[in-house]
């Protein structure tokens, strides 16, 4: 299932406040306060959750937009994945420009899994 925020732009921190807090705290503790601020400001594009596999993903729109050369000539690709010792179930995906583009959640805790499941069922905008 997928949830899209076409007409209703909300930050990651407002859609998933507890998860944003935990991930941002971990980023700050490891010297990545820049990414913590970016995570809190990113706009949620889509939320997906596969109940059978117990895997979720949140696609993010970073605050910093690509310029025309980056977008049309270089192109956006997956650049880096940041994993955490706590929480182990979450990882961040950065593009080849170092911008945050997604959060992957493998076997999240039951409450977060429920929130992902519910959020992925919503249809906001057209």
Regions found by a protein language model. Give the residues of each.
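Intrinsically disordered terminal and processing segments
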Residues: 2-91, 96-97, 103, 107-126
